[in-house]
UniProtKB/Swiss-Prot annotation:
Native source organism of the sequence: Erythrobacter litoralis (strain HTCC2594)
UniProt keyword S-adenosyl-L-methionine present: yes
UniProt gene name: trmB
Binding-site list for substrate: 140, 172, 211-214
Residues at the catalytic site: 136
Protein name from the UniProt record: tRNA (guanine-N(7)-)-methyltransferase
Gene Ontology CC entries for this record: tRNA methyltransferase complex
Pathways involved: tRNA modification; N(7)-methylguanine-tRNA biosynthesis
């Protein structure tokens, strides 16, 4: 994750965590070499629906999509919406590219790198939805500034979402949960927590599929998972 530095509106411009794992299979490498450049957002300038998809459409952004299960599910569900996913871990990107190819999804753009670099270039008020699912927890206090949920990024999330737009956040990590809610309490001027009672954060909302990461958290580690929806005021 990138870290927030006081006085820096976005990030330290530094990635933490791994960006490559085991070697890619031949076809995955082919997709990274050929499909990825075709569906990457432009390296410079504004990141708009018109530039990415050739027309105005509701824009969604997923930060750290892992293997892309959620991104692909959402894009398939909403074919007339445009989806941008950012993920620095190349093996995750390769897995997402395979799904994009198999399902012939024309409404996904993928950035292999830091989400905040691309999000920063999305015009203010342009996003309909923003997703942050199971961000790296950085559980030690001394690493708290590396967490994606910090005042700088959250301020940027607020800027990029349109009024009525939604920020979805999920975690299975109790330390991150407490930290995230503390941060969000500082941004109640921008975000309204869409909640009526505990079942709202204990049960997965419809249209929010389980990722492989989440499945493992539940079944292998016995973790609870918490779901949050925040509406941009
Ligand atoms: C615990 S995984 C969760 C993956 C996925 N969201 C899921 O729920 O399955 C956290 C992901 O965030 C990614 N990540 C870390 N820093 C990031 C950054 N600055 N921008 C985008 N993604 C980042 C990691 O590479 C990793 O894939």
């Amino acid at each position: 994750m990138t870290a927030f530095k006081q006085g820096d509106p976005t990030t330290l411009n530094r990635l933490y965590g791994r960006s490559i794992g085991k070697p890619l299979r031949t076809h995955q490498q082919h997709l990274v070499d050929n499909l990825l450049p075709q569906i990457s957002p432009p390296a410079e300038g504004p990141v708009t629906a018109e530039r990415l998809f050739g027309e105005d459409c509701p824009l969604h952004f997923e930060i750290g999509f892992g293997g892309g299960e959620h991104l692909v599910y959402r894009a398939d569900l909403l074919p007339n919406h445009g989806f941008i996913g950012a993920e620095p871990f190349l093996n995750g990107v390769a897995s997402c590219l395979s799904q994009v190819e198999e399902q012939r999804l024309a409404n996904i753009r993928i950035h292999n790198g830091d989400a905040l670099e691309v999000l920063d270039r999305v015009p203010d008020g342009a996003l309909t939805m923003l997703y942050l699912l199971h961000p790296d927890p950085w559980p030690k206090n001394k690493h708290a500034k590396r967490r994606m949920m910090n005042d700088g990024p959250v301020k940027m999330f607020a800027d990029k979402l349109k009024p009525g737009g939604e920020f979805r956040f999920g975690t299975d990590h109790p330390v991150y949960l407490r930290h995230a809610l503390m941060v969000m309490r500082r941004h109640t001027d921008a975000f309204e927590w869409v909640v009526e009672g505990p079942s709202d954060w204990q049960n997965r909302p419809s249209g929010w599929p389980e990722t492989r990461y989440e499945h493992k958290a539940r079944t292998k580690f016995g973790h609870e998972v918490w779901y949050f929806r925040f509406r941009r005021r």
